[in-house]
């Protein structure tokens, strides 16, 4: 009776350990969007936080989540760094082609936000 219980436990342990890695690395993105919506931090602080998160994501050889580069691009545009904004919008389009229509809109109608 003891042997079958050990076998079942070993099988369950083996199954639990084989989970796939996450598709995207969300490091710092969700808090950054929350801060943006609450307007608790100025845009440059938010840019700094997202750039740091992006470095951490790249260090793990992972992919940032959808919207990460778009958010960073909108923050760059809000502080007048249009070149950096366009670069981020382009990165979003490349990683997530389904965002192309919106990224093209932002690239065409970039405006400085209050």
Regions found by a protein language model. Give the residues of each.
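Bacterial Sec signal peptide processing site at the extreme N-terminus
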Residues: 11-32
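Sec-dependent bacterial lipoprotein signal peptides
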Residues: 1-15
């Amino acid at each position: 009776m003891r042997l079958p219980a050990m076998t079942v436990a070993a099988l369950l342990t083996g199954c639990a350990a084989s989970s796939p890695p996450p598709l995207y690395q969300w490091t710092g993105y969700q808090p950054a969007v929350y801060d943006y919506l609450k307007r608790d931090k100025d845009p440059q602080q938010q840019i700094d936080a997202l750039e740091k998160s992006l470095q951490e994501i790249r260090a793990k050889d992972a992919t940032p989540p959808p919207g990460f580069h778009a958010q960073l691009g909108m923050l760059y545009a809000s502080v007048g760094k249009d070149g950096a904004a366009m670069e981020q919008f382009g990165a979003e389009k490349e990683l997530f082609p389904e965002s192309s229509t919106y990224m093209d809109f932002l690239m065409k109608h970039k405006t400085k936000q209050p």
